[in-house]
């Protein structure tokens, strides 16, 4: 994906959502549960609404330096927040907003991919996909910004799959009269290989498992299917 096309897609997806509700404002709790949460917050000293998965994101391939760079931009924002006590609750799609800053980093990796070929380009695109996935984290179903970020994540992953030497394709898995879309990753196609099936939590995407496949499964001739 060219830099201009990537930028245009981002602008198209987010143009109607610049005043979208900030993620922390979307979850509604039962009165009894809200009381418990309020009491817990009184005893917790946390500065972020989201749980920052620094170790996991680094393991998945994100540079710790880039990660801290994004978090510092979010933390230092002067824009209004849904909750002043939580740094990552900047309202509106602009600088300092969680989704905005991670999308910006993802687009930088897409730009780098345009200057590379083969596996290097694929790695940049898969990293871009991870950034877009984090932009939508924790992937609440009614979060419009997160939904748009997922579109970018899937697009970047698809672009990366076309450049890598490995085979990545979507398949349909029948389940209870329905069909589930899954991503199948194959290190080679000249013979049948064992398959590792992964089903992550609701706060992750199918596109988050690239490094697990490339670094740990593919060298051992293991395929990966992520449902």
PLM regions and their residue ranges:
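An acidic- and aromatic-residue-enriched active-site/binding cleft used to recognize and process polar
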Residues: 187, 201-202
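N-terminal cap/lid segment of alpha/beta-hydrolase-fold proteins
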Residues: 102, 148-188
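Short beta-strand element of the alpha/beta-hydrolase
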Residues: 192-201
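A short, Lys/Arg-enriched amphipathic alpha-helix followed by its capping loop at the start of a domain
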Residues: 216-222
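Alpha-helical protein-protein interaction scaffolds
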Residues: 52-160
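Long, non-catalytic architectural segments outside compact domain cores
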Residues: 1-94
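Conserved small/polar residues in nucleotide/adenosyl-binding loops
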Residues: 225-227
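The serine-hydrolase catalytic nucleophile loop
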Residues: 203-214
């Amino acid at each position: 994906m060219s830099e201009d096309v990537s930028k245009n897609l981002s602008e198209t997806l987010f143009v109607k959502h610049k005043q979208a509700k900030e993620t922390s404002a979307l979850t509604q709790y039962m009165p009894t549960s809200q009381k418990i949460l309020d009491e817990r917050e009184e005893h917790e000293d946390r500065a972020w609404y989201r749980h920052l998965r620094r170790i996991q994101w680094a393991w998945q391939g994100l540079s710790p330096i880039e990660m801290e760079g994004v978090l510092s931009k979010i933390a230092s924002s002067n824009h209004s927040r849904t909750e002043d006590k939580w740094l990552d609750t900047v309202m509106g799609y602009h600088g300092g907003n969680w989704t905005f800053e991670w999308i910006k980093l993802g687009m930088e990796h897409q730009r780098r991919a345009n200057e590379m070929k083969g596996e290097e380009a694929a790695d940049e695109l898969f990293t871009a996909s991870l950034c877009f996935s984090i932009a939508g984290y924790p992937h609440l179903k009614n979060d419009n910004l997160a939904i748009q970020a997922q579109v970018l994540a899937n697009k970047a992953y698809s672009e990366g799959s076309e450049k890598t030497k490995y085979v990545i394709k979507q398949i349909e898995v029948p389940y209870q009269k329905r069909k589930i879309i899954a991503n199948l990753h194959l290190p080679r196609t000249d013979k049948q290989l064992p398959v590792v099936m992964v089903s992550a939590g609701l706060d992750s995407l199918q596109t988050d498992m690239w490094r697990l496949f490339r670094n740990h499964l593919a060298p051992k001739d293991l395929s990966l299917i992520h449902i």
